[in-house]
């Protein structure tokens, strides 16, 4: 029996090492701000209170049920936002707390008070705006008149040139 031939040991080729590439720097991802499917909580609360027209004010439970029904949002997720908004609005005077403390009890829409100084400022700014509008209208009218005069002059010039050409052509 013939013995199997031994192969000559071939020199092993080592795998080529590719030159090391510097790791790519990842640019920070810009997250798009997702817009909520509902208006701001403050607006929803004021709408709820206004819609219920309760004489003694609207309770937090009623406000929440109105928001859940009208805007179809998860009330459990909005609860902390509603509570914070109620407290802040009471503090600012936009809402009036009829009974209870903090974010509990009954709430009504508060009367927004304007000081005399702010009312005067508002009047002054309105008057300035009116004056500006009048000045703009006057300027525009003057421009229109000037443009019309230019057009008329150009047309007259053209007519005169045409007459002169006809007169030259006749003799």
Curated annotation (Swiss-Prot):
Stretch list, region Disordered: 1-40, 133-171
Classification via SUPFAM superfamilies: Winged helix' DNA-binding domain
UniProt KW keywords: Chromosome, DNA-binding, Nucleus
Protein function: Histones H1 are necessary for the condensation of nucleosome chains into higher-order structures.
Provenance organism: Echinolampas crassa
Stated name of the protein: Histone H1, gonadal
GO cellular component: nucleosome; nucleus
H15 domain segment(s): 37-111
One of the record's GO molecular function terms: structural constituent of chromatin
